[in-house]
């Protein structure tokens, strides 16, 4: 929304659905920054829907963009009821929690939706596999605020800590266990590679990872940092970023690691594999394979010159393809085509 405000091409309004975990301080911070926003009730789908309809009739948008499961269902239903001219659905993950009924609702809405956006080619493919219309389903890759990584070139790869970071929330989707087992294998091989885990998430998953680290006797080389207020600084202090995961949409933490000039190593899964060309700008390893991950990390330790070149190429890739202004331009160009189809 801030990017749309900055571009001046559209008048945006951010609508948030209040949930139990919605942090009020973040809402207040957005308002303090001048972000136009409205919070709708989230205690029931009916309450959300009714307030969205009222808001749409008052604001009278030309386009309603509904993000995320299952909010994209209620958002588009409200848009239909309020007579919003154009509806856009944005999908953020390759493996959303669609039940048969929710999928039927989404397909029904898809026939009345102008544009369906996957945040990566992997997500677009997943949408097509679920039966969404190919002629209106596109990929617009996520972008990040690249300016936070401007100092990366002042942190030469060879002068960084020979250590790895995995910046990811603790959740069932992520695979912290495979990285821990890989570190244990490296220890058996006589290779000392410290690893820092940064991120919040579910305490049960975090505690399970910490217990596994203790059982593998890794307390001398594994750090659980929790929430990190300066992820760019953390990444730019390390040589390697790792994303061990089961599936993704478009992993911004990996893009951030690349922008920070780290050598990226990640699981070869949907939403990830399109980011990395092994041997050129990082490495991909089979999902849930501690052996393969340990082998990859060992190659980086033993061949630092090649890893430094890959890290440099990864940074170039992130800067060229994943900036927030580029993502905003792609969305706004798509919106213009909806509003002015004759200009296509």
Question: Over which residues does each language-model region extend?
Answer:
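Conserved acidic donor-binding segment of nucleotide-sugar-dependent glycosyltransferases
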Residues: 278-279, 283-290, 299-304
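A conserved mid-protein helix/loop that constitutes part of the nucleotide-sugar donor-binding site
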Residues: 1-3, 166-191, 207-208, 291, ...
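A short, well-ordered alpha-helix in the C-terminal region of glycosyltransferases
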Residues: 299, 306-321, 327-330
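Glycosyltransferase donor-sugar binding loop
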Residues: 14-22, 167, 194-208
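Aromatic "clamp/platform" in nucleotide-sugar-dependent glycosyltransferases that forms part
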Residues: 227, 246
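A conserved, positively charged/aromatic
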Residues: 88-117, 130-132
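Short hydrophobic beta-strand element within catalytic cores of glycosyltransferases
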Residues: 15-16, 263-266
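Carbohydrate-associated surface elements
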Residues: 122, 143
